[in-house]
């Protein structure tokens, strides 16, 4: 199935039905009084997150989604039927934005999360509501309210714990296929990966994490060059970035240090927040470097690159060093979760002070 991570749709809710202006008509009851029912509520348009969907392709072609109008009220105090709601199933990770106002309507981050995109109009009142002691035969009624109409932008940002960065042919796809159940296309030419791939890494029977592989970046990606800039948004939800560098490029004229710097520069241009995320350096293709030259090659790279963060040396093809990297990632993600849990459990001192002041005021009163 083709991967589509952006779409624009129009959500049109149903109008409310009109209220009825009618009067009770029965034998031997010449002045039966008003009995007009209310109009039905217009149908609403909802979105629900579904983990079984991984693309927005359905919304690339079906752009208009219209809910039914509510039925008009009738005599004998009959209310109009409500319009049927419609529900749009979207991938988990979809960000929904109102194109006219720029308002973020919803961020669907959990399976089953449901949100209203366009609310149906309220049904109008029938003349039964206007009966009073001075107006025994009201002829006024209220028309239904129009439903909401919105132009929406849908952006899919995949939910992953770890994101892979690197130049084309750095070995990202080989790496994710080695450590996870993902099976991306692997070939010896640039831009083999054309869309994001997700892989679940099983550390043991109880622990796992998700890795996202995006198309390789090239210099100028933030301005639109290559493919990667289209998919950098998929790394915004990750907790850790792995910068994979080809330590032994096929073309000897290519400098791995210059390529690594180019990737970091593109990241900074695209999004400062993404640039500030925790980032580890992963030197790949050790199998292409003779064992007696590895230490010197790595030392020279780190000296020229001036990198002081975590460094891992691997061969995605043979699996050398991959297991150690997996366990380090697991420990890092566990530490992040522990910090988040501690932050949630920490009491709000400001709230305690307010409660103390309220209690003291009550005692003095």
Swiss-Prot record:
The enzyme's E.C. designation: 3.6.5.-
Residue numbers binding Mg(2+): 173, 193
UniProt superkingdom: Bacteria
The OBG-type G domain, residue ranges: 160-334
Function: An essential GTPase which binds GTP, GDP and possibly (p)ppGpp with moderate affinity, with high nucleotide exchange rates and a fairly low GTP hydrolysis rate. Plays a role in control of the cell cycle, stress response, ribosome biogenesis and in those bacteria that undergo differentiation, in morphogenesis control.
Family: Belongs to the TRAFAC class OBG-HflX-like GTPase superfamily. OBG GTPase family.
Protein name according to UniProt: GTPase Obg
Organism: Cupriavidus taiwanensis (strain DSM 17343 / BCRC 17206 / CCUG 44338 / CIP 107171 / LMG 19424 / R1)
Gene that encodes the chain: obg
């Amino acid at each position: 199935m083709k991967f589509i991570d952006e779409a624009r749709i129009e959500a049109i809710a149903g109008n409310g039905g009109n209220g009825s202006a009618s009067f009770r008509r029965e034998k031997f009851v010449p002045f039966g009084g008003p009995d007009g029912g209310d109009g039905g509520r217009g149908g609403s348009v909802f979105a629900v997150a579904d983990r079984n969907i991984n693309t927005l392709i359905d919304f690339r072609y079906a752009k208009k989604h219209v809910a039914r109008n509510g039925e008009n009220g009738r005599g004998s105090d009959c209310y109009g039927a409500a319009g049927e709601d419609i529900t749009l199933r979207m991938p988990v990770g979809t960000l929904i934005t109102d194109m006219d106002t720029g308002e973020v309507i919803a961020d669907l981050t959990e399976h089953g999360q449901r949100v209203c995109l366009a609310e149906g109009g309220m049904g109008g009142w029938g003349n039964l509501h206007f009966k009073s002691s001075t107006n025994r035969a009201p002829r006024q009624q209220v028309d239904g309210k129009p439903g909401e109409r919105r132009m929406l932008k849908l952006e899919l940002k995949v939910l992953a714990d770890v994101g892979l960065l690197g130049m084309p042919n750095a070995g990202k796809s080989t790496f994710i296929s080695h450590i996870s159940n993902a099976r991306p296309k692997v070939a010896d030419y640039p831009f083999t990966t054309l869309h994001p791939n997700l892989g679940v890494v099983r550390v043991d029977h109880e622990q796992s994490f998700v890795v996202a592989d995006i198309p390789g970046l090239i210099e100028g990606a933030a301005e639109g060059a290559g493919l990667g800039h289209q998919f950098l948004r998929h790394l915004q939800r990750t907790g850790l970035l792995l910068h994979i560098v080809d330590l032994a490029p096929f073309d000897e004229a290519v400098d791995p240090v210059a390529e690594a710097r180019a990737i970091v520069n593109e990241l900074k241009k695209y999004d400062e927040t993404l640039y500030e995320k925790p980032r580890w350096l992963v030197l790949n293709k050790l199998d292409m470097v003779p064992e007696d030259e590895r230490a010197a090659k790595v030392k020279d790279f780190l000296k020229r690159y001036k990198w002081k963060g975590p460094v891992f040396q691997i061969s995605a093809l043979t699996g050398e060093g991959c297991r150690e990297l997996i366990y380090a990632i697991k420990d890092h993600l566990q530490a992040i979760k522990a910090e988040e849990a501690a932050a949630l459990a920490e009491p709000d001192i400001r709230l305690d002070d307010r409660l103390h002041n309220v209690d003291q005021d009550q005692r003095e009163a």
